Amino acid sequence: NVLQQLGLGSGKRIGVEKQGFFFTVDEHQTLMEILPDNEFVEATEILWDSRMIKSQEEVDVMRHSASLVDMAMLAGYEATVPGATADQVSGVVNKTLFENGGEYMGLPPFILAGERSCLPHQTGGNVPLLDDDLMYFEISASKHRYTAALMRTIFLGTPKEEWLRVAEACIDAVQAAMETIKPGATPHEADTAARDVTSKAGFAEYHRNRLGYSIGVAYPPDWGEGEIISLRQEEHRPLQPGMTFHMPPLCLKYREFGIGFSESIVVTETGCERLSKLPCEIVIKS
């Protein structure tokens, strides 16, 4: 027993990650049975606190991941044509990620066409794109397990006016949040800034998700670490330099559309910076 070899066999107070994906109830029960003279206490938040602020070296790796996402997103744009399916476009995106040095992600790319985009954590689909259609992308990339992600929506032909107004509101919401984020500001304030934009544009009922969540090291079954800290109404801890987030404000109208735009960012000493270099703009392929 490793704990016994380390002199922790009895009479010790040992922290365990009760909220970890890979520490099961059965494993916890086994520890208590074979080492009954130890006290096992919850230590998850100690680990979360150590992961919340990234070093410059960690941010640099995440910038590299963001560059992979940019390449994959552009490849996805190119492959999005009438008649193509979301599954086919997903194949192009994955090929681009792995050919350029990416590693397996915490979650697959979420690439959805037309009305299927209203349920954004579906994967793919085999229904061909129409001449006047939309394609929703939420893609991550991983390098040395450090993750960056990006959400975009592109349009084919002549998009509906409502789609374009929603897209503009989502882009403006991202920008408003970035202008709010700085050391000392709170996630509540950032979420409010984004939500004010979509509300004033008339889409409050479609914008129901939190603004964003922490990102960093990730393994399946997730690419985020929102359990550590999220950009949401209920979170009031002050933001600090070195925190990294994926911010995907999106609007979902059931059986009609899912439209969103996002940025992965790092909080700096004076504000925040994008990790991606891909423009956050409306793209229409005619």
Model-derived segments and spans:
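Active-site neighborhoods and metal-handling regions in enzymes and metal-associated proteins
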Residues: 1-286
